[in-house]
Amino acid sequence: MRGGLERGGLALAQTAVATFAQPQQGDTSLVVNTTEDFDYDYILDCQPTAHKSGLALALSNRKVQLRSLDTLGLVHEFHAHNSTINEVWTSPSSPYQLATCSSDECVKLWDTRAALPAMVVPVGREVWSLSIGCGETLLATGTNELAMFYDVRTGNKLGEYGESHIDAITKVRFHPTQPAFVVTASEDGVVCFFDCRIPDEDDALESILNVESAVTTIGFFGPQKENIFCLTGTETLDLWNLWTAERLHHYATIRDDCNNNSLPTDYLINCVYDDNSNELFLLAGNHDGDMNAVNIGTDTASAGKLQHAATLKGGHKAAIRCIYYDPETTTLYTGGEDTRLCKWAVPGTASASAEASDGYSSASSSNSRRTTGLDPAGIRKARKASRPY
């Protein structure tokens, strides 16, 4: 992200409307009065497919979309689950392989070239998070209190860890460079680091981190991805070393700190780690759809320090749910509760000048709608809550 900021900063390049409002009682007219409170399909999650071939979106209408990273054009769409899709995972090796988990108590593995799922794993509990590791052979799922493991090749359950958490497991993530190690994070405020090659839970537990508040988002950072950041439901940020279980810093008032420095912040979205500059950036948002990128101090000298890096506004009209940053093209993608997918790029680059390929995706058409007052589906106002969900 530092590279993009130094080359002129990130600006809105394109906007795609993922879904349009369904007509009610035969009314097919566009909604003109955008002050009304309409129900919109949220973009809940976004993940890049292998070889940067596209972007997979999980929508609140229980569908998955595949879109072009260059144009945001719609490539493929299918109905995935019978309840909320909580996460989507994409294979790092095959652009056609992805997995989804849902509150309908199952995980589905997909080959997007086929109409039906390649495999359905009946977990039997609401699945809040999933990750696949160990050479894409082991599926880890986060459910109520249990981390459950399955063989991706057969769908058979291999085991579970159920003693380390006392509340719902909100995130499971295999380590990016040590694929036999998995992190679990929970609403109980605890983050655990396991060697999942070991079936006994006590023996498998490498470290345990007490974040002290319900964990909503985690991610790895550092040259060897030896550290982890944790965002919580009370809008705090924790930085830890996974291997030593050392707390690097606890940002207890980071939302207030942003507001006190004229950075309007209602919630914390996610963090982006820049491998090239070894910097961690926090993306914080407000209910109007604006974002600020804040550089987070991670070493001893800079711990506790915050530095405003960029303001991103004009793309969204409601809370932002998910982000993906492509370091190769210095491009940021954001999805929100306004059913919009936005692309932010350095002005003048190839990524910023890519043309839209269908009627769903166009920066110019989006600007035209704002000018005329017409907005397809009348964007729903963000809920006035401390979290966007």
Where are the regions a protein language model picked out?
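A positional/structural detector of protein chain ends, strongest at the extreme C-terminus
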Residues: 1-4, 385-389
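A short helix->beta-strand "capping" segment at the edge of beta-propeller domains
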Residues: 4-42, 71, 304-312
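WD40 beta-propeller repeat blades
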Residues: 87-268
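Structured C-terminal portions of repeat-based eukaryotic scaffold domains
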Residues: 198-329, 334, 343-356
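Beta-propeller domains
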Residues: 57-76, 301, 342-344
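Repetitive beta-architecture junctions, highlighting loop-to-beta-strand starts
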Residues: 15, 62, 73, 96, ...
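Beta-strand-rich domains and repeat architectures in extracellular enzymes and scaffolds
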Residues: 37-62
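WD40/WD-repeat beta-propeller blade N-cap
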Residues: 35-43, 78-85, 121-127, 162-169, ...
